[in-house]
A protein has these predicted regions:
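Short, small-residue-biased leader/transition segments that mark boundaries at the very start
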Residues: 2-13
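Short, well-ordered alpha-helix to beta-strand connector turns
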Residues: 9, 147-148, 297, 318-320
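Short secondary-structure boundary/capping segments
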Residues: 12, 127-132, 338-341
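Serine-dependent acyl-ester chemistry module
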Residues: 17-98, 121-129
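Conserved, well-ordered alpha-helix/loop/beta-strand core segments that scaffold catalytic motifs
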Residues: 78-142, 264-300, 305-309, 321-322, ...
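Extracellular serine-dependent O-acyl
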Residues: 109-117, 133-163, 183-186, 191
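Long, hydrophobic, well-ordered secondary-structure blocks that form the structural core
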Residues: 126-136, 161, 167-174
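Extracellular/periplasmic envelope-modification machinery, especially enzymes
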Residues: 170-172, 176-277, 282-300, 306-309, ...
Length: 343
């Protein structure tokens, strides 16, 4: 059965859409069959996206402000819908306890948790009126209770940034990441550096856009810091000499500009000769913040517990400082924090 009608909407894409490929010996031998299969698959995805966008536009006309688990906020901002019922409070409590235990086991090191507020927590005024949202104040109170002074609170700093998060993606902007870096520096006794941000692209639509596919969605600018350089980055065995993957700018997910995406373990050699080593336990929010940390450490080991199979304590033993960096709803949902304390 066809995924979508084999004809139709061709004028939308300025060409006739590929019909179902015909399987014949001549077509297979000539290579025509595989070419038509590729075109057909591509066209069905285009049709699916078209209908998703059309459905979202109709729902918006009907007054819906919650489409496919995404709130349509003010100023073209989209927010992931997270309520008290969907925020994983039990797992959040377990993860806080896991980090607390890990920090206690490494009390001879400077251990910091930078748990990032969700976009809607900072930009509450941009949420649709009366939109249900989880109690982030309660979540941060629990953070402070478990981690005390080891918790670096970036909420106020992010609220002072003009665009701390992308409009159509769940990540923070580079400006937001830099503001949080200043909070980390203050909390850990480092002298914060300020870097000029340079536009890498102004054509970014992110993960939340992909859920609604509204054609009038905002494009975001993605900035980076070309002045920050390193000697090498070993990302799961692939070695590069840059913090930035410029080829990501030609792809859909332009946030992969930062290190090219997520890895089980990435080891950065910064070229700073101070002998200091940071262990960074992280989600994808850290990818755009880590460049700002490179001036303070000779080595930074980044670990994503979703993919890493190594024991973490031996990595901590090699480090001078530890930073746990997650966006708060990612932190609550992650089922891998127990790995911190595996012996």
């Amino acid at each position: 059965r066809d995924v979508a009608p084999s004809r139709g909407l061709g004028d939308v894409y300025k060409r006739q859409l590929q019909t179902t490929p015909e399987l014949t010996a001549d077509n297979v031998l000539s290579g025509k069959f595989m070419t038509e299969v590729e075109n057909y698959t591509s066209d069905q995805i285009l049709l699916r996206d078209f209908w998703t966008g059309a459905r979202s536009a109709l729902q918006r006309l009907e007054g819906r402000q919650d489409i496919s688990g995404t709130y349509l906020g003010a100023d073209g901002r989209y927010f992931a819908k997270v309520t008290d019922d969907t925020f994983n409070w039990d797992n959040y409590q377990k993860n806080l306890a896991a980090v607390e235990t890990f920090f206690t086991a490494n009390d001879g090191k400077r251990c910091t948790a930078l748990i990032v507020p969700s976009p809607a927590g900072v930009l509450r005024d941009s949420l649709p009126e009366d939109a249900p949202y989880y109690d982030e104040d309660r979540a941060f109170a629990m953070l402070e209770e478990h981690l005390g002074t080891a918790f670096a609170d970036a909420r106020q700093a992010l609220a002072g940034v003009a665009d701390p998060y992308y409009h159509t993606d769940h990540h923070w902007t580079t400006a937001g990441a830099q503001a949080a870096y200043h909070i980390w520096a203050e909390a850990t006794g480092h002298t914060a550096r300020s870097y000029a941000l340079v536009q890498a692209t102004d054509r970014f639509r992110g993960t939340l856009y992909s859920k609604v596919l509204l054609p009038d969605s905002v494009y975001d600018e993605v900035d980076y810091c070309p002045d920050i350089t390193i000697e090498s980055a070993d990302c799961d065995g692939t070695v590069t000499d840059s913090l930035y993957d410029m080829t990501a700018l030609e792809k859909k997910d332009k946030y992969e500009l930062f290190l090219g995406g997520n890895y089980a373990k990435a080891v950065l050699r910064t070229g700073v000769e101070n002998g200091k080593h940071l262990l960074l336990i992280k989600d994808s929010f850290a990818n755009s913040l880590v460049p700002f940390l490179c001036g303070d450490y000779e080595t930074i080991t980044m670990v994503d517990l979703r993919y890493c199979r190594e024991k973490i304590q031996p990595l901590a033993d090699e480090a001078d400082d530890v930073l746990v960096l997650y966006e708060i709803t990612n932190f609550a949902a992650d089922g891998n924090l127990f790995k911190l304390n595996l012996k």
